[in-house]
Amino acid sequence: MADRRRRLVVLGVMLSIFLAAMESTVVSTAMPRVVASLGGLEIYSWVFSGFLLTSTVTMPIWGRLSDLLGRRRVYLGGLVIFLLGSALSGLAQSMTQLIGFRMLQGLGAGSLMTIGMTIIGELFGLEKRAKMQGYISGVWGVASLCGPLVGGLLTDHASWRWVFYINLPFGAVAVALIATALVDSPRAGRRPVLDYAGLVCFTAGISALLIAVLEAGRVATWTGLDVVGPLVLAAVALAVFLVVERRAPEPIVPLRLFAIRMVLAAASTGFLAGMAMFGAISFVPLYLQSVSGMSATAAGVVLIPFVLGWVAMSITSARLVLRIGYRIVVVAGMLCLTLAFLLLSRWSESLTLGLATRDALIGGVGMGLTMVPMLIAVQSTVARSDLGAATAMIQFFRTLGGAIGLSIMGTVMASRLSLGLSQGDALHGVFVTGLVICLAAVASAFLVPAGRAQDLARADLRSEPTRVGG
């Protein structure tokens, strides 16, 4: 019965993560109809940015809350908030309302990937856990790629509102699965005291930072008042946050985690890999269509081997970690991603679909060798009481790196275009920037402790506060 309930939990986690991942991209093909229906063209980009902002900012918060209050109740709370945001987004009567409801949706979505990965980390042993997290990474990638297609189909054959309503029946199934199959063991000790001051300072600081990054990407400069102002606010808020966290009995982000070499190396490597990865996903299709003259369909096809490589190597990376340790695996992954960007920087107008597919596959293999091994190594290193916070921080830094990387690469492209260079030359500058970032990530990967399979296996023998049961 326990195995059956464990499978139900995994199904509920995968289903909810699929919905959250798809929602990050599903609106892209629906937005022309949304603008025609609601107006607000001048602020429509915040339909995307608002979701990204709240989902990113809340990742560490959700992770820590799950450590303090229990995985089940916090995960269900986040899932319900996500579904409420979905329902209200479908009912929106103005662009301003839609943006607000999308931010509510993102608030819930921030919990789903972070706590979902944490639940998997507690339910399974090392090798099985890595395989399951590989599957979840695959679910995320497939859902993100399917989003625009699903959005287009729903918009054409039903209504743009159904890109939000579609979450409700499937989300209800996920709620039922998690609610009935997952049980939190009682937390011993006194009632936890929530770090409200740290929560406010962290939210304000990271929100201001992301607003500055998003604005810099939009205007292609980092010197405007609309960028510098939020950056100053972010610096002040985060400085206060560091002071508050050092004194808080139950900090929302336990700074002591960064004294652990594995956590620090994984956070920095994930941040840099995220900068490069999100840039590739965003600018590769643009190059293929605008410079090489491929169709939108062909450009989309090129991203498929990227996802397949990521999924395949995520699943098999556990065996590699068990045999040779995680530093070698992570370094090999970053070298593959570096090779992919080196090949991207050599693209030309005569690029063939086969070569583009090859390079995307190499990049996907690199990400698969990097992300899941770092996550399972961190989960096997930290105390069980910090598992949610540590898992969330790794994913937070990867997402934050992606947002900053997109902005930097967008600025590079705009600055090169302003010099009169062709779009192809401008995009070459973007890929060279990604190559430099990858080289820095390789150096960061060497900071990952060598590790041995025996060490991971011993670290995996911990008490288990999350279980399956009736």
Can you say where each PLM-predicted feature lies in the sequence?
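Membrane-interface helix caps and helix-loop-helix hairpins in membrane proteins
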Residues: M95, S159-R161, P186-P192, A216-W222, ...
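Membrane-interface "helix-start" segments
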Residues: R190-F202
